[in-house]
Curated annotation (Swiss-Prot):
L-ornithine binds at residues 172, 236, 240-241. Carbamoyl phosphate binds at residues 62-65, 89, 113, 140-143, 277-278, 322. Reversibly catalyzes the transfer of the carbamoyl group from carbamoyl phosphate (CP) to the N(epsilon) atom of ornithine (ORN) to produce L-citrulline. This is Ornithine carbamoyltransferase, catabolic. It holds the Pfam family OTCace_N. It comes from the Bacteria. The gene is arcB. It comes from Staphylococcus aureus (strain COL). GO terms for biological process: arginine biosynthetic process via ornithine; arginine catabolic process to ornithine; citrulline biosynthetic process; L-arginine biosynthetic process. GO terms for cellular component: cytoplasm. InterPro entries: Asp/Orn_carbamoyltranf_P-bd (IPR006132), Asp/Orn_carbamoylTrfase (IPR006130), Asp/Orn_carbamoylTrfase_sf (IPR036901), Asp_carbamoyltransf_Asp/Orn-bd (IPR006131), Orn/put_carbamltrans (IPR002292), OTCase_ArgI (IPR024904).
Amino acid sequence: MTEIQKPYDLKGRSLLKESDFTKAEFEGLIDFAITLKEYKKNGIKHHYLSGKNIALLFEKNSTRTRAAFTVASIDLGAHPEFLGKNDIQLGKKESVEDTAKVLGRMFDGIEFRGFSQQAVEDLAKFSGVPVWNGLTDDWHPTQMLADFMTIKENFGYLEGINLTYVGDGRNNIAHSLMVAGAMLGVNVRICTPKSLNPKEAYVDIAKEKASQYGGSVMITDNIAEAVENTDAIYTDVWVSMGEESEFEQRINLLKDYQVNQQMFDLTGKDSTIFLHCLPAFHDTNTLYGQEIYEKYGLAEMEVTDQIFRSEHSKVFDQAENRMHTIKAVMAATLGS
């Protein structure tokens, strides 16, 4: 029988943004997640968090994040408690500080998915327990662990990988890919119209990490330059939650940046993989997709159905890996 290893040790730490961790710590979490994935595949129990209680705070809805934290908690022997936007009063009827102090006395760890980065920072500051950022408008660190785990599973390494993000350069995925990638020695290319370039503050953090750890950061609106010899092409939705009024403007800006076969041909290699944090608008098989088609005549948006369903696509491995990497973070910061 396989011997259960002790959890990777980051006891008491919070994961609020990628730069909270060193390269070695981030890689350690990825490797630990790969081990936990094998445990689950082989039916090996790994109850590192028996008796623990986990609060799952959701201001923003999510399929993958909620499912991943819930299953990860149960697999680790913990009890997850979901608190949706109608259950919590962060900054409305009760301050984040007061909420944090209450939850910290009842729960052993807190996940937060919402809008404000300051909110998740304050939860960590005042709760006295580990807090994990499930997504804010600024950063998406748990997604990054899954993304780079997926890349490592496909190529066997991270340092020196070329990763191209195509789309809105101002969103949290672009921010996090730049910083996490640079920290892991990855060459990150953000391909976006100039008007959607990431803010300099985020680029500066990424470039600092690149100089420290050996990665690189490129910001360009030239698609051919961005995807040449790239190992992975990553995209995200063109319009995020709360931005629905900007659909027409965003479509006009990004229609030439759709991930399609022509873009993959420009890579010059057959081994390039496709990544997407999901949900993806690649067909009209949703009410949302039908509405976009009726309004704008687009049956596909950020990625074509051909690429989404192709052998290049690793999006469902990536989605599964949310659970394994979140499990690694929880076990590392709470386990003993």
